[in-house]
Amino acid sequence: ARELDKPIILHDREAHAPMYELLRKYKPKGILHCYSGNADDAEWLTAQGLYLGFGGSATFKGARRALEAAKASPPEQLLLETDCPYMAPVPFRGKRNDSGLIAHTAAVLARELDVPEEELLTRTAANARRVFGLEEGGSGTV
C-alpha cells in the first residue's frame, strides 16, 4: 500500500494496543473499519490522519462508546460503512445487511452529531472519495 500510495483498511477487533503500536511504527494512511475504540483513541487515530468507519453496529444498544468516538472525531475523517452481509443496523439487526440500509446508520450518527442526515451523507461520501483518491484530479484507482 505504501509503495502504491494506497490506503489500508484495518479491522481491529479486541486488539487495540497491538494495533496502535503497529500504527505508530508504520504510520499508514487508511481506514479503521468498523471502529470500536473509545473517544480518546479516536482523537489520536484521526490526528495520525486515519479515517474511522462506522457501520450498523453504531445503531446497537451498546454502541455508546462508538458514538462518543464519532463525536470526538473531525467530521472530515468519518465514514459510513455497511460491513455487508453482516452487522445490519437496527431495526434490521440479525438480518442480511446491504448497502440500502446505510441510511439507518446515517440517521443514528447524524442525530448523535447533531447534523442533518443529508449533510452527513454528503460529507461522508466526500470523505470516502478523498481517502480512496477518487476526487477530481485523483488517480481514480483503488
Predicted features along the sequence, with ranges:
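Short, basic, glycine/proline-bearing loop/turn elements
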Residues: 49-55
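Divalent metal-binding pocket/active-site signature
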Residues: 1-48, 60-61, 68-69, 73, ...
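Non-cysteine beta-strand/loop elements that form the S-adenosyl-L-methionine
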Residues: 76-84
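Short glycine-rich anion-binding loops that position phosphate/pyrophosphate groups of nucleotides
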Residues: 57-58, 85
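Amphipathic alpha-helical segments at domain termini/boundaries
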Residues: 87-89
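Active-site phosphate/pyrophosphate- and oxyanion-stabilizing loops and adjacent acidic/basic residues
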Residues: 67-68, 107
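Mid-to-C-terminal alpha-helical segments outside catalytic/metal-binding sites
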Residues: 102-142
